[in-house]
Amino acid sequence: ASIVASHFHPEFVVNVKETGQTLMVNYPDINNLKITTIGTERFLHDGGWDSTQRYFMVAANQRNTIAVVDSKEDKLVKLVKDGVGKIPHPGRGANINDPKFGPVWATSHLGDDTIVLIGTDPAKHPKQAWKVVRTLKGLGSGSLFIKTHPKSNNLWVDSPLNPTAETSQSVAVFDLKNLDKPFEILKIAEMAKLGEGPNAWCSRSTTRRVTKVWFSVWNGKTQDSAIVVIDDKTRKLKAVIKDKRLDY
């Protein structure tokens, strides 16, 4: 389902989807691999590191669970179930410094409109560690990716698989300095001005200096696609990139 490299050992963290197992594959001797098998949860999917890059947070999406794996000690820390929404789909998730709860990792969901924040600081915030500490209401179900950056004050959440076209073509933007503030809706596909057709946007990335956010507006093969560039600070449109090479 997913594979990442450990920041503590010469190991790959391999999540084997249906088995409910996470394998810590030690690779210095490629002909004699040493594998530590960690029992996590079935239907593992994608996930990402906490802010320290020690704990891997992986979604077992059909179990509505987030498994927390300690890549330093090679062991399961916890299966977070309480408070997790329906079918979590974090991509890599998003690391945030919550004003109230400290460092947290966030995921959105395919099956509902919630965004849950899980505490990830057992040293300084032990009461919040490995628990859902805050739940936000997003734009809608069908979310695939949730993104931010240490230098950004925004949390970007998509809903490209939502059955409502207006929702699937837009993004919700939360203010990280005030998470109780209502999110702003940006109509990404409308900004692209592609006419009829675009049914979803997907894939958000930032420039190296984190001044701009790039969105792909995907369309059918016989229609135009585009890249929409947003200023991360002002949330205003900077540019729309159109090219026939984007249509394939």
What is the role of each PLM region?
Residues 1-248:
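Predominantly soluble domains enriched in secretory-pathway, periplasmic, or organellar proteins
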